[in-house]
Design a protein with these regions (language model features):
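N-terminal Sec/SRP start-transfer signal
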Residues: 1-12, 23, 285, 294
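Internal alpha-helical transmembrane segments of multipass membrane proteins
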Residues: 2, 244-264
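Conserved transmembrane alpha-helices of multi-pass membrane proteins
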Residues: 310-314, 324-337
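Hydrophobic, regular-secondary-structure patches
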Residues: 15-90, 100, 114, 213-215, ...
Length: 337
């Protein structure tokens, strides 16, 4: 029975994690067609720019970013700038139209009006206890171990309603805010062409541009263009084999548990011959005695499966809870291994 419980627990957790992870990746992509960023791993670019899991591949010129947004193939484009965090929640420098991607709505406060003001996601507000008009300082890097920018604190001016996407775990501010902390102030005042951003989130006017636009960027610039849907499909193709292996192992464990239950029943029959003989003398037929033994085995199997399903749900919820505490989220920011 213990093997049955173990096998069903593993199967339940595997199925839940696999399905929830797929749903989460789908929800976190607001129908973006392509991401443009520094050359490197396309998957890394997608994970860092949309799902905010991996580290960025580097920075690109803000001047080039503006030119790409003006390209005839592009319907919508917004730059983002990464590099800092607060208590492991990433700080994203961007433009106000970024919120349109997620149909985000302000619950309290408003969107920033000047640099060093920020809007925080639903989970950020709950976890950090930040409120409107409160100040906080970001840490350099994407985990909460870097140098603190104590000289330039952020002010919370808005809190977003819950979206069920990665936006709930982000701190959103203006590009100017990020540049003030990492660039020369004279460059911001005089000319922004020398400044940099991390990536561009883009939508096409026409889906046929998916064939020509990435090739144009990848061949003719020092940047790369990556398709979110394509890269995530590749990712799940790779991880799918691991899930299959886990499920096969679970099925093997469950099968062994059935064999174990069978041997247990046979052993019980041998040990309970006297009891069975009494049943025979009381008028029980062989078929009825066999059905009693069969029901006993099915009951053990059912209980093992049921307990395994319950344990699987408990294990999954525990993983989800502790993942949320660590900001490596199954429901928004799943930490890949």
């Amino acid at each position: 029975m213990l093997l049955m419980i173990l096998g069903m627990t593993i199967i339940t957790v595997s199925i839940l994690v696999n399905q929830i992870t797929k749903d989460t990746f789908n929800k976190n992509n607001p129908n973006l067609d392509v991401i443009v960023g520094a050359k490197g791993s396309p998957l890394q670019l997608v994970l860092s720019s949309i799902h905010h899991i991996d580290i960025p591949t580097g920075n690109i010129s803000y001047k080039n970013a503006k030119n790409i947004i003006k390209h005839p193939a592009i319907k919508f484009g917004v730059p983002i700038s990464l590099g800092d965090n607060f208590q492991n929640f990433r700080i994203v420098g961007t433009e106000k139209k970024f919120f349109k991607l997620y149909n985000a709505q302000i619950e309290t406060g408003s969107i920033w009006r000047k640099p060093m003001q920020s809007v925080i996601g639903f989970n950020v507000a709950n976890s950090t206890k930040l409120k409107i008009d409160k100040f906080f300082v970001g840490s350099h890097g994407l985990i909460d171990t870097g140098d603190v920018h104590a000289e330039q604190p952020y002010k919370v001016v808005g809190v977003l309603k819950k979206t069920g996407t990665i936006l709930d775990n982000l701190i959103i501010t203006s590009l100017d805010s990020v540049w003030l902390l990492h660039s020369n102030k004279n460059d911001i005042k005089n000319s922004r062409d020398s400044l940099e951003v991390t990536a561009l989130l883009l939508k096409y006017k026409n889906k046929t541009s998916a064939f020509s636009f990435p090739r144009l960027i990848n061949r003719n610039t020092n940047m790369q263009a990556a398709s979110p849907n394509l890269e995530i499909s590749k990712l799940f193709k790779l991880t799918g084999e691991a899930y299959k292996a886990i499920n096969y192992l679970s099925i093997l464990i469950v099968s062994l548990s059935f064999v174990g239950i069978l041997f247990t029943l046979l052993n019980n029959i041998s040990e309970r011959r006297y009891d069975l003989a009494i049943l025979r003398t009381l008028g029980f037929s062989k078929e009825k005695i066999f059905s009693i033994i069969l029901i006993e085995g099915m009951t053990i199997s059912f209980l093992g499966s049921f307990i395994g399903l319950i344990f699987g749900g408990i294990v999954y919820k525990s993983i989800e809870y502790f993942s949320l505490l660590g900001k490596n989220i199954i429901a928004g920011q799943f930490e890949l291994i």
